[in-house]
């Protein structure tokens, strides 16, 4: 089961809040489907920071072996969020496959 934590959303302008929340909930559902047989409860953490004109968005997901963390910067917070989630998807799938490969290797020995 994946739990979603949104931090510092108040730094983002009000007009983007609903769009950001819907994107995050969709991604949470995606990760729930991907990790439905995973035996550890996961937390998907999305953090927003605003410095001058740029939004820095970072997302992390705790897996068994390590914490996968991805960060992006953009002027538009929604674009930055989409970039973060696409990069996080690649990194999480890669790490998940490594964990699976390691598990199968240990099981055969």
Predicted regions and their residues:
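Polyanion-binding surfaces on beta-sheet-dominated domains and ring/shell assemblies
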Residues: 1-109
């Amino acid at each position: 089961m994946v739990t979603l934590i949104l931090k510092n959303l108040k730094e983002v302008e009000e007009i983007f809040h609903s769009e950001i929340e819907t994107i995050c909930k969709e991604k949470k559902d995606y990760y729930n489907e991907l990790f439905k047989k995973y035996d550890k409860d996961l937390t998907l953490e999305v953090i927003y920071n605003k410095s001058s004109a740029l939004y820095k968005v970072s997302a992390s997901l705790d897996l068994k072996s390590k914490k996968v963390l991805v960060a992006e910067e953009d002027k538009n917070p929604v674009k930055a969020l989409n970039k973060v989630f696409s990069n996080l998807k690649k990194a999480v799938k890669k790490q998940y496959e490594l964990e699976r490969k390691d598990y199968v290797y240990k099981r055969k020995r």
